[in-house]
Amino acid sequence: MPSVRKEFGGECWTCSEQARDEFGLYWIRGAPGDGIHTDPDTILHGMNSGHQAINLACVFGAKRILLLGYDCQHTGGKSHWHGDHPRTLGNARCVAAWAKGFKQQAIHARLRDIEIVNCSRATALQCFPRSTITEAL
């Protein structure tokens, strides 16, 4: 994490109090479930960091969110575009369950007039409108 903090100029957020304390990250309360939480101090984890990132964007007031790398499938036999995580972190074993969570999130976003566009090149997600990143920008 220290090398990421050096190279990445943006904010780093976590739902883990341990990671907050160990790495000096911004912290927000995480709760189990799918969709978008109604409490602005809490995000729903949806069993994956992509779900959490959408929730965090909503907390920050985003009205349009463009998704990249949301494949929700094992594209090319890989569990992640960046390679496997260490064993302790897990490696995308429940992508079908993630898709169900994103479907709930899409419903919540529409109810809040938040546009979410999936600009991922390869994806199993059908719940968000699709576009290329070039067209969406």
PLM regions: where:
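Metal-ion/cofactor- or nucleotide/acyl-coenzyme-handling active-site neighborhoods
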Residues: 1-137
